């Protein structure tokens, strides 16, 4: 599994007084409902673990729309998390959407200084998405990981603002 070697970021090691004060937005695509539901559940669980009881959640049609929504949200939030699923088909569309989402979200983060957690699954098969969605039987929980990374980065950056 590609998650081998990933850092272990434990939200409980962060100061709850810091994380609970952060304003968090989650923007989630709508394709591949079962996988997206798992990603969003994991993201909301991570927010709750960090003391953020009600993050703002915005739904968009697909992963291609994530960057523009994240850019708008970054104007009002301390951290943004983007969740989506792109599964390879028989055309180059997969590469175009994956690159646009990845580069767009990177641009949002770099240009605004707001951490954008990358929870976009780019999979060859639906099973790969299910394995990473945080569902019962999944090997990974990428929604939880994306929120954890965004909040840990936001706390770190606040030390230098």
From Swiss-Prot:
SUPFAM superfamilies: Lumazine synthase (SSF52121)
Known pathway: Cofactor biosynthesis; riboflavin biosynthesis; riboflavin from 2-hydroxy-3-oxobutyl phosphate and 5-amino-6-(D-ribitylamino)uracil: step 1/2
A Gene Ontology term for the protein's cellular component: riboflavin synthase complex
Enzyme Commission numbers on file: 2.5.1.78
Pfam families for this protein: DMRL_synthase
Active site, renumbered: 93 (proton donor)
GO molecular function: 6,7-dimethyl-8-ribityllumazine synthase activity
Keyword entries, A-Z: Riboflavin biosynthesis, Transferase
Record InterPro entries: LS, LS/RS, LS/RS_sf
Gene3D superfamilies (UniProt xref): Lumazine/riboflavin synthase (3.40.50.960)
Residues binding (2S)-2-hydroxy-3-oxobutyl phosphate, per UniProt: 90-91, 132
Functional note: Catalyzes the formation of 6,7-dimethyl-8-ribityllumazine by condensation of 5-amino-6-(D-ribitylamino)uracil with 3,4-dihydroxy-2-butanone 4-phosphate. This is the penultimate step in the biosynthesis of riboflavin.
Family, similarity comment: Belongs to the DMRL synthase family.
HAMAP family with a match to the protein in the record: Lumazine_synth
Name of the featured protein: 6,7-dimethyl-8-ribityllumazine synthase
Lineage, broadest ranks: Bacteria, Bacillati, Actinomycetota, Actinomycetes, Micrococcales
Gene: ribH
């Amino acid at each position: 599994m590609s998650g081998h070697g990933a850092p272990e970021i434990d939200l409980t090691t962060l100061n709850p007084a810091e994380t609970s004060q952060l304003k968090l937005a989650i923007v989630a695509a709508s394709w591949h409902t079962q996988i997206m539901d798992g990603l969003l559940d994991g993201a909301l669980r991570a927010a709750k673990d960090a003391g953020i009881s009600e993050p703002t959640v915005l739904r968009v049609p697909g992963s291609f729309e994530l960057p523009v929504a994240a850019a708008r949200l970054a104007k009002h939030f301390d951290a943004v998390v983007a969740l989506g699923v792109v599964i390879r088909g028989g055309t180059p569309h997969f590469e175009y959407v994956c690159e646009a989402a990845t580069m767009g979200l990177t641009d949002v983060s770099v240009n605004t200084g707001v951490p954008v957690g990358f929870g976009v699954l780019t999979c060859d098969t639906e099973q790969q998405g299910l394995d990473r969605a945080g569902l019962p039987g999944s090997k990974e929980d990428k929604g939880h990981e994306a929120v954890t990374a965004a909040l840990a980065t936001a706390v770190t950056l606040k030390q230098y603002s």
